[in-house]
Each structure stands twice: as C-alpha cells, then as structure tokens.
A protein has these predicted regions:
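Hydrophobic N-terminal alpha-helices or hydrophobic patches in metabolic proteins across all domains
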Residues: 1-134
Length: 134
C-alpha cells in the first residue's frame, strides 16, 4: 500500500481554526517544489528569479481541494525555516484570496502553534506591518 501525504494525513481535529499543514517549500527559498499527486513525493517545479523567494513556509492542507484541483495552499509563519514534508500544526489567522488563470487559488495564512514567538498572533492584523508588505 502506497502512502500519500495529501490523502492519508488528517487535516486535524480542531479544523478550521487549527489545521495541519505539510510544508513543501521552506521560507526564503528560491526553489518551487510541488507535491506529485501520483507518487506523493516532492518534485522541483522551477527555480525562481534571484529577487523572489517565499516569505513564509509554504505548503498544503491535507484532504482539501481548491478550484484548481490542488490541495488548499497554506503559508505557515514561523521564525524558522521548516523542512519540506514536515507536518506542522498551525493556527489559521487569515486568507489571501487569489485567482490563478480563471480559478480560485486561495492561500491560508497561519502561524505555527509550536513557535512561541508567534503565540500572540490571533488574526492577520496582529502581524507586524513589514510582514504584510512581504
């Protein structure tokens, strides 16, 4: 039997306020990795331009779908770079409504529950202004 992180990992018992996310891309990395839907492994999609990187750890929420037939994306804010394929519990603080092509491609904004430096953040408005600009 083959294990697939998208289909075989729980979203968490406290969803939608607290969810589990699987990190694909650590923050400040210029590589765009994606989960291969069939194998469950990460593939290198592309390398981003030198001035572009991810301001937060980027991944997906298991057992979810967005309009683009991919799992729902999540940006997990933490003071550390979280390694790819790490399962992270995160407090949801907001959503970035996005359209890719003609399809909804929302990004859930969350903070890692086990990162004490972000325990005070309960809503996206609690983030420092400089983070929102990034």
């Amino acid at each position: 039997m083959k294990f697939n992180p998208w289909h075989d990992v729980s979203i968490g018992d406290n969803a939608p306020g607290v969810v589990k996310g699987i990190i694909e891309i650590p923050k400040n990395v210029r590589a765009k990795y994606e989960l291969d839907k069939e194998s469950g492994m990460l593939i290198l999609d592309r390398v981003l331009f030198a001035s572009i990187n991810y301001p937060a750890n980027y991944g997906f929420i298991p057992r979810t779908y967005c309009d683009d037939d991919d799992p729902l994306d999540i940006l997990v804010i933490s003071q550390i770079d979280i390694v790819p394929m790490c399962l992270v519990e995160a407090n949801v603080i907001g959503v970035m409504r996005m359209i890719d092509g003609d399809e909804m491609d929302d990004k859930i904004i969350a903070v890692a529950t086990n990162d004490m430096s972000f325990n005070h953040v309960k809503d996206i408005s609690d983030l420092p202004a400089h983070w929102l600009i990034e």
